[in-house]
């Protein structure tokens, strides 16, 4: 089976925060799992280097947009690598390859009659002497009356036109823009109304889209899909490949989602492999992002794919809700966020991954709390998982000189592990990552209970053979926990694999155990709870 996984493209205008990672982490879990299953996986993403936010940041700092994009793209790559993300291709939207692919898609849509020209009114700033792209216009949402950008309201998820906003202001200078006529290209989105309606009905029946994606898309379909501009007067981006319109750029909402397609083509060129199997209609596809990106993946991208004749529209939409910080809405402008480069300097990446999975905003907003983060590490990763691994392997090191005791796998334990693989695998495929991880940790707690009840420290003297059986089965459990947890906690799983000399990485019960155990090190270190106050002081002290 061919598995295509697309992770949303973060804007390269500032550092990643935990909200980004909470929404993107499911993609890596899926990729690792399906590779272990032996499936053909293509997992792609990249940095959005063409968006208006980059141009705004560059103007604020007095540097070029390219400098801003380079800085944060490199930082993103480093952060994703340090968090264990296993992208097959992580690229950027200002690459020559991406520009060519997007222009080809634009021309195909134009040739098929899905794009047309239209004279429209657009916000124009007399002070800045330029037409204002949607994100350059800010004001009040006409639907919910909250603060909003010209392209979308984060409060109610409404897709907006800048002219819809109340109390419009230029983001660059704060003046009120005038309205002037200009010519733009439009995408005939309304012609895909019935196909999008069918897609969301199928997703509702099969449960392959998150509830928020189903509800929001049903709302758009009920209201009627409206044609959308596909060109804008932007300072950076992909030029319109039509004579006389080269100064205009392809609008980011259609350009950025086409990044999945361009990254796939780039991967094929770089590896010499064929990517057509990921777009032939038979592939299982997963699109992973936050709920603010739902319309681009449930409406826009399917329509583009239908328009260019590609058979695979999003089968699974994994759209997480929002992550708050200490019960407050995350705000990058106010510096109310936990920044990824910062937290990675001081904490184990598996601790970050664990917390963001068990507290994932899969169906509702969830909160990141420093207290909960540190206590979950100490109680679950160290106290449950690390404790079971350490007490077992240290026992072998101390009483058997590192030589693996002889034994046979307990039938009940074997059956329990086989059922666990099946249950966890099904949960991952259904994008129920929290359920999957909690199931494994239920088994970890069972393993600790098994160790306590068997009392190998007493068995060693009273019944040495039984003691060997106990420890042998504990190592069997550890080997399988490492394998089951690899999609979630890859770093600690790798440490266990090295200690146990495990070579097999397939998604199946591990029955081959080592002959000896070497160099037993603690799987996790305790975090001093005094760090809670230190982190809170740092967080509150940085608020703007």
From Swiss-Prot:
Coiled-coil spans in chain: none
Subunit-structure text: Monomer.
Recorded E.C. number(s)? Answer: 6.1.1.10
Q: Transmembrane ranges?
A: none
Q: Name one GO cellular component term.
A: cytosol
* Keyword hit for Protein biosynthesis: yes
Protein's UniProt name: Methionine--tRNA ligase
Cofactor dependency: Zn(2+)
Co-factor binding details: Binds 1 zinc ion per subunit.
Predominantly, its location class is: cytoplasm
Q: Which reaction is recorded as catalysed by this protein?
A: tRNA(Met) + L-methionine + ATP = L-methionyl-tRNA(Met) + AMP + diphosphate
Q: Which organism is it from?
A: Bacillus cereus (strain AH820)
Keyword Zinc-finger listed: no
């Amino acid at each position: 089976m061919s598995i295509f996984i697309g992770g949303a493209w973060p804007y390269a205008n500032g550092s990643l925060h935990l909200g980004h990672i909470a929404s993107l982490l499911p993609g890596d879990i899926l990729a690792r799992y399906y590779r272990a299953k032996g499936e053909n996986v293509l997992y792609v993403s990249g940095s959005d280097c063409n968006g208006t936010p980059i141009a705004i940041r560059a103007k604020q700092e007095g540097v070029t947009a390219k400098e801003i994009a380079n800085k944060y793209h490199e930082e993103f790559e480093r952060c994703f690598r340090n968090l264990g993300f296993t992208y097959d291709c992580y690229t950027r939207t200002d690459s020559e390859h991406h520009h060519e692919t997007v222009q080809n898609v634009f021309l195909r849509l134009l040739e098929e009659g899905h794009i047309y020209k239209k004279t429209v009114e657009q916000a124009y700033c007399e002070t800045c002497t330029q037409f204002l792209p949607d994100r350059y216009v800010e004001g009040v949402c006409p639907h919910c009356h909250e603060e909003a950008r010209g392209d979308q309201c984060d409060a109610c998820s409404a897709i907006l036109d800048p002219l819809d906003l109340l109390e419009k202001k230029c983001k660059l200078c704060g003046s009120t823009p005038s309205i002037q006529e200009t010519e733009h290209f439009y995408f005939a989105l309304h012609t895909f109304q019935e196909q999008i309606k069918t897609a969301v009905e199928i997703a509702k029946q099969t449960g392959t889209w998150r509830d928020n994606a189903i509800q929001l898309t049903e709302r758009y379909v009920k209201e009627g899909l409206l044609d959308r501009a596909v060109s804008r007067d932007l300072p950076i981006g992909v030029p319109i490949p039509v004579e006389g319109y080269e100064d205009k750029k392809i609008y980011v909402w259609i350009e950025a989602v086409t990044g999945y397609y361009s990254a796939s083509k780039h991967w094929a060129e770089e590896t010499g492999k064929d990517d057509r199997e990921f777009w032939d209609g038979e592939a299982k596809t997963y699109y992973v992002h936050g709920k603010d990106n739902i319309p681009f993946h449930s409406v826009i991208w399917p329509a583009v794919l239908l328009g260019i004749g590609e058979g695979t529209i999003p089968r699974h939409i994994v759209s997480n809700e929002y992550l708050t910080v200490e019960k407050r809405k995350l705000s990058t402008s106010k510096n109310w966020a936990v920044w990824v480069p910062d937290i990675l300097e001081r904490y184990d990446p598996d601790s970050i991954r664990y917390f963001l999975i068990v507290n994932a905003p899969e169906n509702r907003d969830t909160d990141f709390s420093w207290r909960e983060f540190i206590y979950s590490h100490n109680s679950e990763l160290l106290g449950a998982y690390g404790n079971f691994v350490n007490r077992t392997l240290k026992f072998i090191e101390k009483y058997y000189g590192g030589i693996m005791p002889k034994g046979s796998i307990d039938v009940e334990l074997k059956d329990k592990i086989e059922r666990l693989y099946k249950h966890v695998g099904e949960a991952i495929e259904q994008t129920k990552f929290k359920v999957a991880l909690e199931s494994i940790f239920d088994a970890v707690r069972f393993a600790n209970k098994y160790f306590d009840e068997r009392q190998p420290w007493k068995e060693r003297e009273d019944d040495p053979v039984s003691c060997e059986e106990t420890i042998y089965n504990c190592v069997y459990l550890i080997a399988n926990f490492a394998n089951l947890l690899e999609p979630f906690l890859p770093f600690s799983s790798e440490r266990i694999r090295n200690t146990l000399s495990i070579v097999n990485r397939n998604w199946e019960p591990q029955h081959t155990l080592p002959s000896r155990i070497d160099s037993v090190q603690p799987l996790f270190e305790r975090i001093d709870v005094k760090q809670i106050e230190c982190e809170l002081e740092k967080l509150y002290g940085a608020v703007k």
